[in-house]
């Protein structure tokens, strides 16, 4: 019976020695995520248990959604009895209790922005209490109403075709839900011809008819509010389009023929007004005689003719002279 008592006594003393030589830091944070509207103030609760000494240090850091804890960036830290805010949130981050040496290390973040959404780490170090790292995690979501969505349209908007209407907000937390509705008193599309996805914001319209034309509205909503956009859908009949195309082609053909006929008639009228060409002395043909040669030949011909006309008189005079000589 003595040995169990001795064993219990020894174990108690050993446990006390371990506890005194180094206590485990215990950090407590809320287990539920925190959601706060944009522009408001968030209080991120953090408490701890340890025997605060000269080596006590506290650090708050931030991790963006989807990134590992190793990618955290400091928000503020307390060491050597002084508080040091740092980073892009330095002017909006303070401690609710300063100095945080009484077991409370709550972080107060003012004027919340969408970029503040993420995970916040409350880290307490108090050497020689190294048995745990004293880390607590808090998830913060900054609530933002949906921004004005953008409506878009794609597909074949003719009779019998299909069209896809899109709707998307650039901002909104939590993510908005999208709902499409048709405005006016137009008949409701047949079941199955109008399918929408509330998550992606897409509306699929199949087997379009002329009655599918109209105004469609998309409403993006979350717990912070709603916003909407509208789109006008115009369904055309392909047969009417072909008839219109044929008519336009015929009209263009008639117009071109009219222009061609007008130009031809005008050309003929202008041609009749032009004077007829006459032959000029300066114009030479390939088989024509040079002007100088023709004039010389003409002069010789005239001279010969003149001699022929005078030849009888000359002959008589010669004969008379000859007769007189003989008489002498």
UniProtKB/Swiss-Prot annotation:
Pfam families: Ig_3, V-set. GO terms for cellular component: plasma membrane. It is found in: Membrane. Residues 145-234 form the Ig-like C2-type domain. The keyword Hydrolase does not apply. The chain crosses the membrane at residues 245-265. Disulfide bonds join 46-122, 167-218. This is V-set and immunoglobulin domain-containing protein 2. Expressed in the stomach, colon and prostate. Residues 25-138 form the Ig-like V-type domain. The keyword DNA-binding does not apply. Residues 266-328 are cytoplasmic. It is a single-pass type I membrane protein. Glycans are attached at residues 139, 207, 232.
């Amino acid at each position: 019976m003595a040995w169990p008592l001795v064993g219990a006594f020894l174990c108690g003393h050993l446990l006390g020695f371990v506890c005194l030589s180094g206590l485990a830091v215990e950090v407590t944070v809320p287990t539920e995520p925190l959601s706060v509207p944009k522009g408001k103030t968030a209080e991120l609760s953090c408490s701890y248990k340890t025997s605060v000494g000269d080596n006590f240090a506290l650090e708050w850091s931030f991790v963006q959604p989807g990134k590992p804890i190793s990618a955290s960036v400091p928000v503020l830290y307390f060491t050597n009895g002084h508080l040091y805010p740092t980073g892009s949130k330095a002017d909006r981050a303070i401690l609710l209790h300063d100095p945080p040496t009484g077991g409370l290390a709550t972080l107060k973040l003012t004027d919340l922005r969408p970029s503040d959404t993420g995970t916040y780490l409350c880290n307490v170090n108090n050497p020689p209490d190294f048995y745990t790292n004293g880390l607590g995690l808090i998830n913060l979501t900054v609530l933002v109403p949906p921004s004005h969505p953008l409506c878009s349209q794609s597909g074949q908007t003719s009779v019998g075709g299909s069209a896809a209407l899109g709707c998307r907000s650039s901002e909104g937390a939590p993510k908005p839900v999208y709902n499409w509705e048709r405005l006016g008193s137009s008949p409701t599309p047949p079941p199955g011809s109008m399918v929408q996805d509330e998550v992606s914001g897409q509306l699929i319209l199949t087997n379009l008819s002329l009655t599918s034309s109209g105004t469609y509205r998309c409403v993006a909503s979350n717990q912070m509010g709603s916003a909407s956009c509208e789109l006008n859908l115009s369904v055309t009949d392909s047969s009417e389009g072909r008839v219109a195309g044929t008519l336009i082609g015929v009209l263009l053909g008639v117009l071109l023929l009219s222009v061609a006929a007008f130009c031809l008639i005008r050309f003929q009228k202008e041609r009749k007004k032009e004077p007829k060409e006459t032959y000029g002395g300066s114009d030479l043909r390939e088989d024509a005689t040079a002007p100088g040669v023709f004039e010389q030949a003409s002069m010789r011909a005239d001279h010969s003719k003149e001699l022929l006309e005078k030849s009888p008189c000359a002959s008589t005079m010669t004969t008379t002279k000859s007769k007189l000589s003989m008489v002498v």
